[in-house]
């Protein structure tokens, strides 16, 4: 038995040593591979720099030229084809990331001046210089690239802005028209006046919106029940149809995540972007044939974009009026109590109310369960007593018969 155990132990030790050796070999191979890749990059970089010097392509800063080369490798197409895609604003050829990279690597004024003043054979220049020269063939190429980028982003920007504006408008409408919320507010005011009876606050005609959050406080020092739980208990017994008032406020949570300042910034960005498109359209009229396709496509796009921007601008204007009306609805001043604070307070109230209502529901269910169990026990006791009485009555009859 001991020999078998020793043999098994030795077997597992050998397996462990073998696995460890394989892991060490694998780790060494990965280190060598990483080192080789790093060395290869240095070799390629140095080789490229040497080649750069041989070909006299030292007009552009070496680091910038190298980074430009890396960027162009990701585009993977001849420079004339790339520029045709830019002027044709062809999203099937160039994606937004590639466009942003092209913008980053547009030649500066100094670099363009350097290339224009170069009197040598331009064919001997490096790929970075060739790329810059290709871009320089198109007047205002950086502006055109930015137009292309705006066009790609425009659809998503308009969609998201529309969504945000509609959410805010819907939330304002839902809150102001919810009869259930209005009834709950009345009941809260009534309960507050009852609890504060005999004090200066016992005849209030309204309350601040922030007071809704005070309902999570205890009714008194002698009880663990909060005002919110008491409210839910009253509603459950007197107006249970109001307990699901939060269903009226479908867009409240989404609206609470939206900041009007962000919507304003998006609106400004889109409006300014459209202005730049019109400026570029005017500027490109003097470009000549090279920008003919670009001008036609841009003109068509502006026509569609202007209609969409006009629609969203109208929607944006309505949001300002609706949010102010909502704040006034609760007797607050938009300058002191902004829309974001209204939705945040209401959402907190809804969550506190929902939690309290659930807890009261569970508590009530437990009480009813205990009540039912108690009634069942009483019924059993009643039956036992009845049966005992019957038996006792039967014994008495037999005894009387014997007598």
Swiss-Prot record:
Q: Which PROSITE patterns match?
A: FH2
- Provide the FH2 domain boundaries: 1-380
What InterPro entries does the record tag this protein with?
Answer: FH2_Formin, FH2_Formin_sf, Formin_homology_domain
Q: Where is this region: Disordered?
A: 373-403
SUPFAM superfamilies in alphabetical order: Formin homology 2 domain (FH2 domain)
Q: Which family does it belong to?
A: Belongs to the formin-like family. Class-II subfamily.
Please report the name of this protein according to its UniProt entry.
Formin-like protein 21b
What is the originating organism of this protein? Answer: Arabidopsis thaliana (Mouse-ear cress)
The taxonomy runs:
Eukaryota, Viridiplantae, Streptophyta, Embryophyta, Tracheophyta
Q: Which gene encodes it?
A: FH21B
């Amino acid at each position: 038995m001991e020999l078998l155990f020793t043999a098994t132990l030795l077997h597992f030790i050998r397996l462990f040593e073998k696995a460890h050796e394989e892991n060490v070999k694998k780790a060494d191979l990965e280190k060598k591979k990483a080192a080789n890749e790093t060395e290869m990059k240095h070799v390629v970089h140095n080789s490229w720099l040497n080649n750069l010097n041989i070909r006299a392509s030292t007009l552009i800063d070496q680091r910038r030229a190298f980074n430009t080369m890396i960027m162009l490798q990701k585009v993977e197409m001849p420079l004339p084809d790339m520029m045709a895609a830019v002027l044709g604003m062809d999203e099937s050829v160039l994606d937004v990331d590639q466009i942003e990279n092209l913008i980053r690597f547009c030649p500066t004024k100094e670099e363009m001046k350097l290339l224009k003043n170069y009197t040598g054979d331009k064919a001997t220049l490096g790929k970075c210089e060739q790329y810059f020269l290709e871009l320089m063939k198109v007047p205002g190429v950086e502006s055109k690239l930015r137009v292309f980028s705006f066009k790609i982003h425009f659809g998503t920007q308009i969609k998201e802005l529309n969504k945000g504006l509609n959410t805010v408008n819907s939330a304002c409408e839902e809150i102001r028209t919810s009869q259930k919320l209005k009834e709950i507010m009345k009941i809260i005011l009534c309960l507050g006046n009852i609890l504060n009876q005999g004090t200066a606050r016992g005849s209030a005609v309204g309350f601040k919106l922030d007071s809704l959050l005070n309902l999570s406080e205890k009714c008194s020092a002698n009880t663990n029940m909060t005002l919110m739980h008491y409210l839910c208990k009253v509603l459950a017994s007197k107006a249970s149809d109001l307990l699901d008032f939060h269903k009226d406020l479908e867009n409240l949570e989404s609206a609470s995540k939206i900041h009007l300042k962000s919507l304003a910034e998006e609106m400004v960005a889109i409006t300014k972007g459209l202005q730049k498109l019109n400026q570029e359209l005017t500027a490109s009229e003097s470009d000549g044939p090279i920008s003919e396709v670009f001008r036609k496509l841009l003109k068509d796009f502006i026509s569609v974009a202007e209609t969409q921007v006009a629609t969203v601008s109208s929607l944006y204007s309505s949001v300002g009026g609706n949010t102010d009306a909502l704040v006034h609805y609760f007797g607050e001043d938009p300058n002191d109590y902004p829309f974001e604070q209204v939705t945040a307070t209401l959402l907190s109230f809804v969550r506190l109310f929902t939690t309290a209502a659930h807890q009261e529901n569970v508590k009530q269910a437990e009480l009813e369960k205990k009540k039912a169990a108690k009634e069942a026990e009483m019924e059993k006791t009643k039956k036992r007593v009845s049966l005992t009485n019957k038996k006792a009555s039967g014994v008495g009859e037999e005894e009387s018969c014997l007598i």
